Curated annotation (Swiss-Prot):
Biological classification of the source: Bacteria, Pseudomonadati, Pseudomonadota, Betaproteobacteria, Burkholderiales
Gene Ontology annotations for the cellular component aspect, listed alphabetically: cytosol
Domain of life, per lineage: Bacteria
GO molecular function: nuclease activity
Record protein name field: Putative pre-16S rRNA nuclease
SUPFAM superfamilies: Ribonuclease H-like (SSF53098)
Length: 146
């Protein structure tokens, strides 16, 4: 998805897990991400109702979903589950989804929390924030989404 230069865009990012989904929000002009909330992944209906409320509240222009890989870059079982989740987000909410390699995002989130820069009960949201920050850091100056 491409945006005109200088246009502000709100983004929601997701760190998908079988039990919890971390959510972060960010802005393309400030290029800052912050942890938002953790959605309990109880059932398909529950998670999409919760995500739908977040989308209605934040009105994002695009979504970012972290894709987990093994350290060597090989996919594993969670890679496919996260990809399915992102595809379902796109289908349900008609918003563009961008994938970000999330290797080490949880490790980095734990380090941030240990350093006093986050809350332990928000670990998954911190990981989503790291995923989104990686994406924002990669944006070109004309805000072209990849």
């Amino acid at each position: 998805m491409s945006l005109p230069a200088g246009r502000e865009a709100t983004l929601l990012a997701f760190d998908y897990g079988e039990k919890r989904i971390g959510v972060a929000v960010g802005n393309s002009l400030t290029r800052r991400a912050r942890p938002l909330v953790i959605v309990q992944n109880r059932s398909r209906e529950y998670r999409f109702e919760a995500v739908g409320k977040l989308i209605a509240e934040w009105k994002p222009d695009a979504l970012v979903v972290g894709l987990p890989f093994h350290p060597d870059g090989a996919p594993h079982e969670m890679t496919q589950l996260a990809k399915r989740f992102g595809n379902q987000l796109n289908g349900r909410f008609n918003l563009p989804v961008t994938w970000v390699d999330e290797r080490y995002s949880s490790v980095e989130a734990k380090a941030e929390i240990r350093a006093g820069n986050g809350r332990a009960d928000m670990l998954d949201a911190e990981a989503a924030s790291i995923i989104l920050q990686q994406y924002l850091d990669g944006l070109s100056d004309d805000h072209e989404f990849h």
